Amino acid sequence: MLKGKTVLLGITGSIAAYKIAYLASALHKLHADVHVLMTENATNFINPITFETLTGNKCLVDTFDRNFQFQVEHVSIAKKADVVMIAPASANVIGKIANGLADDMLTTTVMACRCQKIFAPAMNTAMYENPIVQDNIRKLNHYGYEVITPASGYLACGDTGAGKMPEPETLLEYILREAAFEKDLSGKKVLVTAGPTQEAIDPVRCLTNHSSGKMGYAIAKMAMLRGAEVTLVSGPTAIEPPLFVKVLPVTSARDMFEAVTGVSDQQDIIIKAAAVADYRPKQVSEDKVKKNDDQASIELERTDDILKYLGQHKKDGQFLCGFSMETKNMIGNSRAKLEKKNLDMVAANNLKVEGAGFQGDTNVLTLITQDEEVSLPLMSKEDAALKILDKIISLTK
């Protein structure tokens, strides 16, 4: 995902410095060219050799290191950078850079970088809330630097409050948003639905399905990484929502209908990946239905057909993509859905094909439009999401 991208990690003197080893490793696994710069104080918390081992690149600390290469190191590395993250960012380094001071390898390199720079402050709550530090953060924001709001929690000093550096997984998402893909969906509003719905029988039981929401969440994340403004309408799932995506949680088919139709006219692209119940109990018991020896039956009624509604109310220039999960006659049933519901594309899969079912991390899709059918091989759901977006972009140019 980051192949061909250069990421600079600036580490300052903080106990949170050890966490950046996990971030450096994760970036390297995504094929980024990772370069680590440390302040002298940072080396008291973690050894530079750790980062050299994880990244395969020399860890830079001394501005005047005799590396015997005919280049000015801090300028050379700055020119290569696609994104810079200073994490943990101490009050000292925040103050230096906010006021134009550059007296070591890290600060001089940051000053020379023209790419996006992201700071992740880590310090005691009283230091973070100090008016001088807050003023310096405002200065960084004014100059176009991004400063991540620190988390609140138990700090190394024993206090509890704001000042905790976000976890490496969160920091990685900031870097991916900035550098993973070209922003070919910039300026577009994308609505994605994901997950199952739950239709109550009584306060204890419900009708639902096996959808995990993974495919829809992957589409939402990839669209965001490609620059779109993404709204995700999600049924109940166990998945952590992607950062930088507006999430509208829902439970029932009626909830999803109301959430989707409430924002659909504002969208450029709608991708409906949710597995919405076709039927719901006609009557919902206020109390738990007790079992007995007799056979039980539940009278059902149709739910609102969200995709049909969207097709009937599609605005000019809006792209509408549906999903079709089949067990037989996949192409025929999906093409009928495309025509009947006025869709621009259907992403179809067959539950009986290995790797294409619910819950898993892979999918096998066929992208069906008015003019063609494109069969995709087995791939991760994130890669499948990218293929869906590629196709949509090609059809909307």
Each predicted region: which residue ranges?
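A cross-family phosphate/adenosyl-ligand binding-site feature
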Residues: 1-119, 124-213, 217-397
